[in-house]
């Protein structure tokens, strides 16, 4: 059942997503070649807790980390590890969120570590642009299928492929709520978007084929053909006159994580 948020609940969602976005940007700013994904996860954990939040990924369905940290051919759900070292030329996806006052934030970004090859950079650029194409379609009166169509058509026109098994979702007092928000679909189909809905739009895009494999750890999802994958995500509030990107801070070059405060 889709939960429609009132004004007070939307304010709670804004707060949780502001911290989530600040934590994500902080993590991205501190990625360094030579560090482990466990070390990166710890930095994000400390940032969230320092600002009064609860890392809402940690323990969810048994996931052990504060963030899903996924390198190169790992699409999503990479488990932070002492054994995974970030190298120059890697692409690193961070997917994380924070819970405050009973409300959940959720966002993701894929970062280049130093200089990456041209095709890897193009994958990042297209996937990020597709996120904003999806958000442009996510306006009151449209339908969920309009979002998926916008993402899918943009990525496939660029020669990339869209993961089918994992999708975006509603957010709120639960991290994952209805409706599902696929990154593929047909215009004019699916639930109608109405003011008060809060949804996470998150393109998961593959360099080559979209077929995936889940690792034996039960979490890590990789491309079957070993190609690269990228993942970007914003949590959004559907309002009457516009759609608000509640996690916009992670993509704001002027946002200073060192000065961030919820007070």
Predicted feature residues:
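Active-site neighborhoods and metal-handling regions in enzymes and metal-associated proteins
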Residues: 1-263
């Amino acid at each position: 059942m889709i939960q429609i948020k009132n004004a007070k609940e939307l304010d709670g969602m804004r707060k949780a997503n502001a911290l989530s976005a600040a934590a994500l940007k902080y993590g991205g700013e501190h990625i360094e070649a030579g560090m482990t994904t466990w070390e990166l996860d710890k930095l994000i954990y400390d940032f969230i807790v320092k600002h009064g939040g609860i890392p809402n990924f940690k323990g969810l369905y048994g996931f052990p980390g504060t963030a899903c940290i996924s390198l190169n051919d790992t699409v999503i759900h990479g488990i932070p590890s002492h054994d995974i070292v970030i190298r120059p030329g890697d692409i690193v996806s961070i997917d994380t969120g924070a819970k405050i006052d009973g409300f959940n934030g959720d966002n993701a970004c894929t970062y280049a570590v130093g200089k990456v090859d041209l095709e890897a950079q193009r994958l990042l650029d297209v996937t990020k642009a597709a996120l904003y194409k999806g958000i442009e379609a996510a306006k009151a009166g449209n339908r969920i299928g309009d979002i998926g169509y916008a993402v899918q058509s943009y990525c496939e026109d660029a020669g990339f492929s869209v993961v089918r098994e994992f999708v975006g979702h509603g957010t709120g007092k639960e991290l994952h709520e209805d409706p599902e928000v696929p990154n593929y679909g047909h215009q004019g189909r699916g639930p109608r978007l109405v003011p008060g809905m809060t949804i996470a739009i998150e393109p998961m895009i593959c360099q080559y084929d979209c077929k995936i494999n889940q690792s034996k750890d039960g979490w890590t999802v990789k491309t079957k053909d070993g190609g690269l994958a990228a993942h970007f995500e914003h949590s959004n509030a559907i309002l009457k006159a516009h759609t608000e990107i509640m996690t916009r801070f992670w993509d704001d070059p002027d946002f200073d994580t060192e000065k961030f405060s919820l007070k």
